[in-house]
Amino acid sequence: MTEVVAVPVRLRPSATAGVRLPELVAQVGAVLADGPGQAATVPDIPVTGVTLRAQEVLSGDLFAALAGASTHGARYAGVALERGAVAVLTDVAGVAELTAQASSVPILIHPEPRSVLGGLAAAAYGHPSNRMTVVGITGTSGKTTTTYMVEAGLRAGGRVVGLVGTIGIRIDGADIPSFLTTPEAPALQAMLAAMVERGVETVVMEVSSHALSLGRVEGTQFAVAGFTNLSRDHLDFHPDMEEYFEAKAVLFDPHSLLRARTVVVCIDDDAGRATAARAGDAITVSALGQPASWRATDIRSPGVGAQEFTAVDPAGVQHRVGIRLPGRYNVANCLVALAILDVVGVSPEQASLGFRDIRIPGRLERIDCGQDFLALVDYAHKPGALHSVLTALLQPDHRLAVVFGAGGERDPGKRAPMGEIAAELADLVVVTDDNPRGEDPAAIRRDILTGTVAAGGAAQVVEIGDRRAAIQYAVAWAGPDDVVLVAGKGHETGQRGAAETCPFDDRVELARALQVRDARLLPAPGRACQ
């Protein structure tokens, strides 16, 4: 069983030499605020940490007071000072929010303080990414799977590994829960420093477009970056697909300060080919027969949920590889992982040993309660991912059911396409709720159903808002050798409504439905989140 460790207030090193405040000020071009109590010059004091959460300040920290969605962080400067902050970094608007108490420490002003946080934190923690090998994985889908594969290969090769991603943080196999794909810049640098302290040699992390756009990985030196694919997602954050692509491209662009020393790119879509062309010297991979540095041939599936293929490396040497994941897209993810592992000195043979028993929470995760059909949970929550996973699960003479919804307060333009994809590929489509947040769940379902109507076809389409009841319906429908997929939430353990997040785990609910299925004693639907 995987070890679960206690979560500290914030994962950070037990000790750090820190950096002098004048050095930090000079590094980022901040200016000292005028006003009562402020010195004429920046005082020569040590800064041993950086945080933007007042409640997490430790003595010696610089507190970054940033503008938030509803309030300015400067309002909490008093809390930060009480906890031992030695300086405050903010913007002009933040200065106006500061109380008189804040005049007891240096107040630094920068027009865009968030943009310099990564560099400040990296300096305060001794530039931890320079003391280890950091691998970054980006792309719309496959980031989590690829990072887990790289981690598994590294551990099989005897390395001490850190992992940072959507599911959580891992240090040498021990799990630490997380809530962001990529943590905020100060937390990330503190985390990397703590990993150095614990003997981690290589860190593999998911790098989201949000993280790249918001500067969360500034101050990080990437040894290797991997690109999986690009399809529609996050258009509630990015104005269009072009900006979404550009956000991810900075890890590969030779003119970018964040560009990794070595880059690995899957060229099985247009975005991958454009990324490789921009990089100029990318190690390329293809699972679709494209000319590439690493290629997959002789792909075979001994059964639903497993594949074997031959990976042909840049020297033309063939390596037989097996993975317990279906779909050509997972062959592509595996090739990206193999190429990255080769760069950092892990052979395909060593990597394959790590892949053999890999289990990725909520990524085509099997739920087996002795039933005579296949039941799976997956994180697919966007059109491209849903298409890929449903295509991977299609088998002659086996019916396919999918239960899914779409998140509220997120890109509404992907709802109808997801409905159309589901109705085109599955035999049973159960449209349900998935983190409606502040939106009307029924309206979200209507958007999805518009797509199922557009698909036409013979799929049976059912609308059941209560997610528990929707899962139970699909389980009751399934017969021998059928496939039931519950998509969208994957590893998540809550259903987000407008006012609360209710405990809800698709894996638990699917197992529960399977356990009572034979007795036909399906319980009444539970309370929906409000």
From Swiss-Prot:
<dbReference type="InterPro" id="IPR005761">
    <property type="entry name" value="UDP-N-AcMur-Glu-dNH2Pim_ligase"/>
</dbReference>
<dbReference type="InterPro" id="IPR035911">
    <property type="entry name" value="MurE/MurF_N"/>
</dbReference>
<feature type="binding site">
    <location>
        <position position="208"/>
    </location>
    <ligand>
        <name>UDP-N-acetyl-alpha-D-muramoyl-L-alanyl-D-glutamate</name>
    </ligand>
</feature>
<keyword id="KW-0133">Cell shape</keyword>
<protein>
    <recommendedName>
        <fullName>UDP-N-acetylmuramoyl-L-alanyl-D-glutamate--2,6-diaminopimelate ligase</fullName>
        <ecNumber>6.3.2.13</ecNumber>
    </recommendedName>
</protein>
<dbReference type="Pfam" id="PF02875">
    <property type="entry name" value="Mur_ligase_C"/>
</dbReference>
<dbReference type="Pfam" id="PF08245">
    <property type="entry name" value="Mur_ligase_M"/>
</dbReference>
<keyword id="KW-0067">ATP-binding</keyword>
<feature type="binding site">
    <location>
        <position position="492"/>
    </location>
    <ligand>
        <name>meso-2,6-diaminopimelate</name>
    </ligand>
</feature>
<dbReference type="InterPro" id="IPR004101">
    <property type="entry name" value="Mur_ligase_C"/>
</dbReference>
<feature type="binding site">
    <location>
        <begin position="181"/>
        <end position="182"/>
    </location>
    <ligand>
        <name>UDP-N-acetyl-alpha-D-muramoyl-L-alanyl-D-glutamate</name>
    </ligand>
</feature>
<keyword id="KW-0132">Cell division</keyword>
<dbReference type="InterPro" id="IPR013221">
    <property type="entry name" value="Mur_ligase_cen"/>
</dbReference>
<dbReference type="GO" id="GO:0008360">
    <property type="term" value="P:regulation of cell shape"/>
</dbReference>
<dbReference type="GO" id="GO:0008765">
    <property type="term" value="F:UDP-N-acetylmuramoylalanyl-D-glutamate-2,6-diaminopimelate ligase activity"/>
</dbReference>
<dbReference type="InterPro" id="IPR000713">
    <property type="entry name" value="Mur_ligase_N"/>
</dbReference>
<feature type="binding site">
    <location>
        <position position="52"/>
    </location>
    <ligand>
        <name>UDP-N-acetyl-alpha-D-muramoyl-L-alanyl-D-glutamate</name>
    </ligand>
</feature>
<feature type="modified residue" description="N6-carboxylysine">
    <location>
        <position position="248"/>
    </location>
</feature>
<dbReference type="GO" id="GO:0071555">
    <property type="term" value="P:cell wall organization"/>
</dbReference>
<feature type="binding site">
    <location>
        <position position="216"/>
    </location>
    <ligand>
        <name>UDP-N-acetyl-alpha-D-muramoyl-L-alanyl-D-glutamate</name>
    </ligand>
</feature>
<dbReference type="GO" id="GO:0000287">
    <property type="term" value="F:magnesium ion binding"/>
</dbReference>
<comment type="pathway">
    <text>Cell wall biogenesis; peptidoglycan biosynthesis.</text>
</comment>
<dbReference type="Pfam" id="PF01225">
    <property type="entry name" value="Mur_ligase"/>
</dbReference>
<dbReference type="GO" id="GO:0005524">
    <property type="term" value="F:ATP binding"/>
</dbReference>
<dbReference type="InterPro" id="IPR036565">
    <property type="entry name" value="Mur-like_cat_sf"/>
</dbReference>
<comment type="similarity">
    <text>Belongs to the MurCDEF family. MurE subfamily.</text>
</comment>
<keyword id="KW-0963">Cytoplasm</keyword>
<feature type="binding site">
    <location>
        <position position="488"/>
    </location>
    <ligand>
        <name>meso-2,6-diaminopimelate</name>
    </ligand>
</feature>
<feature type="short sequence motif" description="Meso-diaminopimelate recognition motif">
    <location>
        <begin position="434"/>
        <end position="437"/>
    </location>
</feature>
<comment type="function">
    <text>Catalyzes the addition of meso-diaminopimelic acid to the nucleotide precursor UDP-N-acetylmuramoyl-L-alanyl-D-glutamate (UMAG) in the biosynthesis of bacterial cell-wall peptidoglycan.</text>
</comment>
<feature type="binding site">
    <location>
        <begin position="434"/>
        <end position="437"/>
    </location>
    <ligand>
        <name>meso-2,6-diaminopimelate</name>
    </ligand>
</feature>
<keyword id="KW-0961">Cell wall biogenesis/degradation</keyword>
<keyword id="KW-0573">Peptidoglycan synthesis</keyword>
<keyword id="KW-0547">Nucleotide-binding</keyword>
<dbReference type="GO" id="GO:0005737">
    <property type="term" value="C:cytoplasm"/>
</dbReference>
<keyword id="KW-0460">Magnesium</keyword>
<keyword id="KW-0131">Cell cycle</keyword>
<dbReference type="GO" id="GO:0009252">
    <property type="term" value="P:peptidoglycan biosynthetic process"/>
</dbReference>
<feature type="binding site">
    <location>
        <position position="410"/>
    </location>
    <ligand>
        <name>meso-2,6-diaminopimelate</name>
    </ligand>
</feature>
<keyword id="KW-0436">Ligase</keyword>
<feature type="binding site">
    <location>
        <begin position="139"/>
        <end position="145"/>
    </location>
    <ligand>
        <name>ATP</name>
    </ligand>
</feature>
<dbReference type="GO" id="GO:0051301">
    <property type="term" value="P:cell division"/>
</dbReference>
